[in-house]
Amino acid sequence: METTLGSYARTLSLGMLVPSAICLLAGTFGLLGGSSIALWVVIAVSLLGVVGGVKIGGSARRMAGDLSTAIHVLSRSASGDLNARILDVRGSGGIGALQHSINRLLDLAEAFGKEAFAAVESANHGRYYRRIITTGLRGDFVLYAKTINQALKRMEARDAEFIAFANNQVKPVVNAVAAAATELEASSGAMSAQSTDTSHQAMTVAAAAEQASVNVQAVASAVEEFSASIKEISTQVHRAAAVASEAAGVASRTDTTVHGLSDAAQRIGAIVSLINDIAAQTNLLALNATIEAARAGDAGKGFAVVANEVKNLANQTARATEDITSQVAHIQEVAAEAIKAIQEITRTVSQIEETSSAVAGAVEEQNAVTVEIARNVAEAATGTSSVSSAIITVQATAAEATESAGQVADAASELSRQSENLSREVDGFIARIGGR
């Protein structure tokens, strides 16, 4: 009775161990992604071994120990320890086959895992040539290995494609940006130099315009003096006419005296004509001075020449005035002589009166011309002031352009630096992708 109960208990214990082993096998295969066919083969072998063992009657205790060892190894492998093995395979029949199958299964799982790890680790460093070696693998493990190898091959192709894209597409763009930044930096430097040169030129022109303004003021002063001289001439002519008028009642004494007075009057006319010519030339020179001042290019030099000519003409006018004064004095002398022969020069005095009136009219016309010259000189002064104001504006604009050029140069320098950094980053990234 006790023997029967003991056998029943051992048989019951074996019946409980077998499902446990089967569950652990299922867990191990789930962990490893194992084949369902292999799983059922192991289960079938296990059941046959157990049934055979029970049938034959063998040692239930030893069988229970072998199954316990198998369960322990399967538990370790299910926890991720693929180094676990059944070291002392003592079972025979179904139990022995189960133990050997477990060891072979773990050998395959470990070999596949190590190969997969080595291949993926190499790929992680860019060495895609490392593939999973399928020698010794069976069934689904071979399929899994081939799938991983194909994935590694595709990854290698994609990396190569990306590196080619980076070298052929991205890198040229980065280089183009860097070249453009360098060119922009050079252009901004040239622009800054040009702006600085423009500012210096504007300063030079401003100084020349200021000098031109001073020269125009000098011409204006000379014209005022010239106008005063004309007025003085007019006064002297009127005085001469008055003297001639006083001699109107004096008779002419001799023909010679009358001719002398007539000749003196003619010389006065010639001198007045000379004054008229000088005034015309002065007017022309004033016009040239206005044009030279408006050009603002070489205003200083051109205007200096014109001012010198005006000065010479003013000197000629002074000499003509002196000559006129001399001739008027001569007229006075002739008039004094005419007083002695008042009866003889009555008709001549009348002619002198008429001539004096003509001279006065000519002097008035000359005075009008002088006023016009003064007006033109004033306009020239205004134009010179406008040129000075414009040059100041140009100088300010050039200064702003210089500042802007400096800002562009700074931006271009920063862009160039960033382009260099980007180029280094792209090169480094390509290097990391190509040789990880």
From Swiss-Prot:
GO terms for cellular component: cell pole; plasma membrane. Its main location: membrane. Residues 321-436 are annotated as: Required for interaction with MamK and to respond to the magnetic field. Keywords: Biomineralization, Cell inner membrane, Cell membrane, Membrane, Methylation, Transducer, Transmembrane, Transmembrane helix. It comes from the Bacteria. The modification Glutamate methyl ester (Glu) is found at residue 225. One of its GO terms (biological process) is signal transduction. Residues 30 are periplasmic. It is a multi-pass membrane protein. The modification Glutamate methyl ester (Gln) is found at residue 211. Signal peptide: none annotated. SMART domains: MA. InterPro entries: MCPsignal_dom. The chain crosses the membrane at residues 9-29, 31-51. Disruption phenotype: A double amb0994-amb0995 deletion grows normally and has wild-type magnetosomes. It fails to sense and respond to an external magnetic field, i.e. bacteria do not align to the field. Residues 1-8, 52-436 are cytoplasmic. It is found in: Cell inner membrane. Residues 180-416 form the Methyl-accepting transducer domain. Interacts with MamK at cell poles and septa. This bacteria makes up to 20 cubo-octahedral magnetosomes of about 45 nm in diameter which contain membrane-bound crystals of magnetite (Fe(3)O(4)). Probable methyl-accepting taxis protein. May be the receptor that senses the torque generated from the interaction between the magnetosome dipole moment and the external magnetic field. Overproduction interferes with magnetotaxis, cells respond more slowly to changes in the magnetic field; requires the MamK-interacting C-terminus of the protein. The effect of magnetic sensing is to control flagellar rotation. Only the C-terminus (residues 321-436) is necessary to interact with MamK; its addition to MCP25 confers the ability to interact with MamK. Belongs to the methyl-accepting chemotaxis (MCP) protein family. This is Methyl-accepting chemotaxis protein Amb0994.
